[in-house]
């Protein structure tokens, strides 16, 4: 698989004189691009447009202001901000000053934010006035927090105006810690994932090579930068190449279509739920927009439904590429122009083992746990060596994800082990198979198949279904569809019609919230 990665980079970079030298340092990556193309637009939000030169200069001002405030190399600086140019500016300000950025999800509630600010040992918080109400009850009680900087205030504007625009003379090494992401993906509890400068810069050039991102590309970004996929593959990958990134703070199909039309977007990054929504947009609405510039969309973060993705490709006349990865190990498998197969996540770009429950390698076509070895794996979980040891063993990262590989080397993501439904008889059901089947019904828009605890150690397989506008289907009709196509033990015991499937802030199905629904009220 290392050969496939090298092939991608060599094939793409040869003959492309604009491809910058590979950097393993976040600070130097921005500075190199800003030096080469200072007047090229870097970030766009609505009518706000920031060039690479401006991004470099203003982030220097932020860095120097933070250093004057008392930030030192290694200081933890939390960022709680909306998806905006200011987020990018302040993130790079922290990095250039030698700080470690702690990225907080804007969808978190007060108890969650308080817990993460405490756990992360953050000494500075950069935020916006819109978060003051949620922060005010507890912010003065965070023991190590010394400063709260609110960016949309006159005092912040004055602080930046009076700060030097010269890059701080801070010795930042590739192996220095750079960013802490909080995730609950693998072990089911919130924990800080620590990435260094080097681990941050491993996959962006590989993914850029795979999707053939060029300097003239305009990236439509639907993914917040507080997520690794957004920061590494969207922002860092675009900065390395010198592409322009158009931000959409809150996804709606209309916002996406308007951005592509106005900015002549060429590549989009999002999650499957967003592209599912776009696939459902009526043709007469699409005809109002010029979407001819859009050549491909990239998805990650959840399992996509091949049928809907094929509809999307046909409707928009583009290609869909999938990226599979985790916060702890970044991208590990991608689709490319040379290796694309709907229903798969392309081919691995690092070393992979697929292991059965006994730790033995599976045969081709057999399902097992994905275990990866990559140079861009996380440094570890913050202050949690025991948790790190559970998933990182002898350089191999144990994902908890079930996958299988076909005879051509394409990797198919099945689902997380934790999503498996265990019946009262002890049989295991993979939700995606049932979800795919129910989605094939012409009246069904969305499906989530989860196990509701039965009180006896097993689970009640329950399908939550959202119907398309104006369409009708009965539980009996959908049950018959399952009966005709699935083994009896896989059949839903209940089918519940709901108005919408609850999602996480990253657009994934919130199976936890579905399991909390009181079925006695339905």
Segments (PLM) and residue ranges:
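Conserved AMP-binding/adenylate-forming core of the ANL superfamily
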Residues: 18-26, 31, 39-84, 88-92, ...
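Conserved pre-ATP/AMP-binding loop-to-beta segment of ANL
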Residues: 23, 39, 150, 164-182, ...
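ANL superfamily adenylate-forming
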Residues: 47, 130-174, 281-282
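Conserved AMP-binding A3 loop
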Residues: 51-53, 178-202
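AMP-binding/adenylate-forming catalytic core of the ANL superfamily
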Residues: 108, 125, 268, 374, ...
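Conserved AMP-binding/adenylation subdomain of ANL enzymes
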Residues: 201-218, 226-267, 277, 281
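Gly/Ser/Thr-rich phosphate-binding loop
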Residues: 262-270, 279-342, 351, 359
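AMP-binding/adenylate-forming core of the ANL superfamily
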Residues: 353, 364-378, 396, 402-403
């Amino acid at each position: 698989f290392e050969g496939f990665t090298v092939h991608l980079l060599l094939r793409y970079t040869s003959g492309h004189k604009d491809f910058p030298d590979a950097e393993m340092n976040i600070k130097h990556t921005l500075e190199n691009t800003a030096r080469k193309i200072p007047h090229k637009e870097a970030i766009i939000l609505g009518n706000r447009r920031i060039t690479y030169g401006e991004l470099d200069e203003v982030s220097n001002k932020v860095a120097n202001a933070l250093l004057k405030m008392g930030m030192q190399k290694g200081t933890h600086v939390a960022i709680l901000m909306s998806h905006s140019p200011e987020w990018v500016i302040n993130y790079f300000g922290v990095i250039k000053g030698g700080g470690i950025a702690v990225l907080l999800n804007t969808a978190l509630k007060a108890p969650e934010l308080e817990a993460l600010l405490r756990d992360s040992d953050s000494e500075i918080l950069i935020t916006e006035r819109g978060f003051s109400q949620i922060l005010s009850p507890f912010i003065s009680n965070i023991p190590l927090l010394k400063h709260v900087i609110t960016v949309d205030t006159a005092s912040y504007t004055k602080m930046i105006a009076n700060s030097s625009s010269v890059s701080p003379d801070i010795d930042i090494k590739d192996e220095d810690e750079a960013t802490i992401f909080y995730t609950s993906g693998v072990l089911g509890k919130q924990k800080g994932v620590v990435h260094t400068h080097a681990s941050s810069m491993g996959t962006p050039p590989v993914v850029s090579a795979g999707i053939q991102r060029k300097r003239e590309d305009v990236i439509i970004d639907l993914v917040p930068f507080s997520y690794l996929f957004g920061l590494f593959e969207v922002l860092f990958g675009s900065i390395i190449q010198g592409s322009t990134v158009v931000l959409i703070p809150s996804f709606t199909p209309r916002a996406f279509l308007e951005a592509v039309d106005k900015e002549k977007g060429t590549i989009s990054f999002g999650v499957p739920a967003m592209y599912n929504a776009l696939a459902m947009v009526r043709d007469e609405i699409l005809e109002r927009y010029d979407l001819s510039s859009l050549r491909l969309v990239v998805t990650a973060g959840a399992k996509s439904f091949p049928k809907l993705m094929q509809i999307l490709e046909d409707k928009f006349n583009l290609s869909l590429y999938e990226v599979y990865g985790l916060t702890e190990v970044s991208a590990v498998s991608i689709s490319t122009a040379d290796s694309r197969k709907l229903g798969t996540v392309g081919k691995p770009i690092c070393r992979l083992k697929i292991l059965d429950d006994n730790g033995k390698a599976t045969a081709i076509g057999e399902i097992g746990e994905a275990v990866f070895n990559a140079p861009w794996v996380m440094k570890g979980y913050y202050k949690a060596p025991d948790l790190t040891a559970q998933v990182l063993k002898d350089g191999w990262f144990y994902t908890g994800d079930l996958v299988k590989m076909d005879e051509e080397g394409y990797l198919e993501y099945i689902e997380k082990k934790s999503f498996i439904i265990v019946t009262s008889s002890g049989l295991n059901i993979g939700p995606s198979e049932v979800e795919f089947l129910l989605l094939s019904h012409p009246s069904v828009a969305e499906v989530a198949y989860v196990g509701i605890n039965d009180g006896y150690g097993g689970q009640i397989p329950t399908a939550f279904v959202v119907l398309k506008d104006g369409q009708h289907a009965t539980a009996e009709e959908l049950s018959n569809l399952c009966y005709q196509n699935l083994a009896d033990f896989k059949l839903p015991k209940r089918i519940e019609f709901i108005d919408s499937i609850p999602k996480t802030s990253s657009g994934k199905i919130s199976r936890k919230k579905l399991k909390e629904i009181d079925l006695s009220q339905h």
